Amino acid sequence: MEVKDILKTVDHTLLATTATWPEIQTILDDAMAYETASACIPASYVKKAAEYVSGKLAICTVIGFPNGYSTTAAKVFECEDAIKNGADEIDMVINLTDVKNGDFDTVEEEIRQIKAACQDHILKVIVETCQLTKEELIELCGVVTRSGADFIKTSTGFSTAGATFEDVEVMAKYVGEGVKIKAAGGISSLEDAETFIALGASRLGTSRIIKIVKNEATKTDSY
């Protein structure tokens, strides 16, 4: 697989709590230069970033991030606000407390409400696979499918582990037709990226792939 084809799947990501505007600018410049799928950045930078790229790059942001236990109303507001400010894609975090309580209906209803707030913008649902049993992940594949979301996403990159090949294999087997897969967190090589794509991921959330291409990768990057 050619590097340029891998790059087309990448949501070039900077979600560090201390991210500065010059660092965000670098993410945006690199994402445009290497023609990635999007740049994924904190919501507080969306308006400025959207003005900066002026339609040349899709802007992705996160809501309910990274823990997911804010209220549905708060997440809906975050979504609407991000879209108003120029976000093209939304990555939301589900409420894992509902999952652990076995309340999958509430999880599904929340995703439905946020998808309605997204209108025709892309919605990716982060399920935080490192915190799930295999049975919970299988159930959530059905929940995300029924909710009308566009993607199921493995990880925030802020928990105990990121994407694994096994997680993506399970998603590819159990998610419904029309729902795509985003692998995120800890994707540390072009070889891993290619494997995730081969297993069924059509998006990769990472900050490292462009750095690898530019020979700038460091072992301290978690996302």
UniProtKB/Swiss-Prot annotation:
GO MF term list: deoxyribose-phosphate aldolase activity
UniProt superkingdom: Bacteria
Entry keyword annotation includes Lyase: yes
Catalytic site positions: 91, 153, 182
Pathway it works in: Carbohydrate degradation; 2-deoxy-D-ribose 1-phosphate degradation; D-glyceraldehyde 3-phosphate and acetaldehyde from 2-deoxy-alpha-D-ribose 1-phosphate: step 2/2
Primary location recorded for the protein, binned into one broad class: cytoplasm
Gene3D superfamilies xref list: Aldolase class I (3.20.20.70)
Catalytic activity annotation: 2-deoxy-D-ribose 5-phosphate = D-glyceraldehyde 3-phosphate + acetaldehyde
Enzyme class: lyase
Family: Belongs to the DeoC/FbaB aldolase family. DeoC type 1 subfamily.
Function description: Catalyzes a reversible aldol reaction between acetaldehyde and D-glyceraldehyde 3-phosphate to generate 2-deoxy-D-ribose 5-phosphate.
Protein name, per record: Deoxyribose-phosphate aldolase
Organism annotation: Streptococcus pyogenes serotype M4 (strain MGAS10750)
